């Protein structure tokens, strides 16, 4: 009996002492001047992605001013200006999404240096490229800005307090407008007039990003899709669209299909 009582007493002592032990373990580091430092996150050396935009018409390189092109309606036209905004570009796979922070780029067909840009991403294999065609709503309402969003680039409507997301200008003999001009300034960032288009392009093969290396991908922008890809927009019927509204939305629904990711990528 004595042995049994001794065992019970010892067991009870252990239980009663447990909270004290736990408390000691919690406060001891502070008393002894020991700071608990969580394990550092594993750092990685970034790789880089260069996105190159190749402007074409039916697969052939776009030549400004001189070349005559024919749309799906048999209408001839020349292009004198093509500019469009690419915002917040990035890469993704099934578990990882990497996006350029505050990435705003104005691609200008007459300025080769504007047709590519580079940013850092985590090394790995990615399966698709994504970006916003246009400028997000927040930056349409942020007042005067710099860089690609500077109003001096002639892509901002002061009268409407918003950006022109895409601008296509030129001439066409079928245009009933003055001087046979065609002019498409597509904008609208809120409500039913919103023309912002989220673009996601599946890569034909994995896009491999290696640490401290640059991988180049080429995105084709084929403006032949502008005229008809769900919404017929013949030049003769609509030579000019320069305000937000239903026609601008129809054109935006067409031009979202202009983009395709060309096969292969180059690691440099």
Model-inferred region functions:
Residues 38-268:
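A short, solvent-exposed, low-complexity linear motif enriched for acidic/polar residues
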Residues 1-44:
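Bacterial Sec-dependent N-terminal signal peptides
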């Amino acid at each position: 009996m004595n042995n049994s009582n001794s065992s019970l007493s010892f067991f009870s002592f252990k239980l009663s002492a447990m909270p004290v032990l736990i408390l000691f373990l919690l406060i001891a580091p502070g008393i002894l001047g020991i700071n608990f430092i969580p394990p550092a996150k594993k750092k990685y050396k970034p790789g880089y992605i260069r996105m190159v935009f190749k402007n074409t018409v039916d697969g052939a390189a776009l030549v400004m001013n001189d070349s005559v092109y024919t749309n799906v309606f048999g209408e001839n036209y020349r292009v004198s200006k093509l500019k469009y905004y690419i915002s917040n570009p990035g890469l993704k796979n099934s578990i990882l999404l990497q996006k350029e922070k505050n990435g705003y780029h104005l691609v200008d067909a007459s300025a080769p240096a504007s047709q590519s840009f580079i940013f850092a991403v985590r090394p790995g294999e990615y399966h698709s490229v994504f970006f916003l065609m246009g400028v997000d709503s927040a930056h349409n309402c942020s007042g005067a800005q710099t860089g690609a969003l500077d109003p001096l680039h002639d892509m901002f409507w002061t009268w409407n307090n918003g950006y022109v997301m895409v601008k296509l200008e030129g001439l066409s003999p079928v245009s009933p407008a003055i001087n046979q001009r065609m002019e498409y300034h597509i904008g609208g960032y809120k409500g039913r007039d919103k023309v912002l288009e989220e673009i996601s392009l599946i890569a034909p093969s994995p896009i491999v990003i290696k640490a401290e290396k640059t991988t180049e991908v080429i995105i084709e922008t084929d403006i032949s899709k502008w005229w008809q890809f769900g919404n017929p927009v013949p030049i003769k019927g609509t030579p000019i669209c320069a305000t937000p509204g239903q026609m601008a939305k129809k054109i935006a629904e067409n031009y979202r299909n202009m983009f395709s990711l060309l096969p292969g990528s180059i690691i440099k």
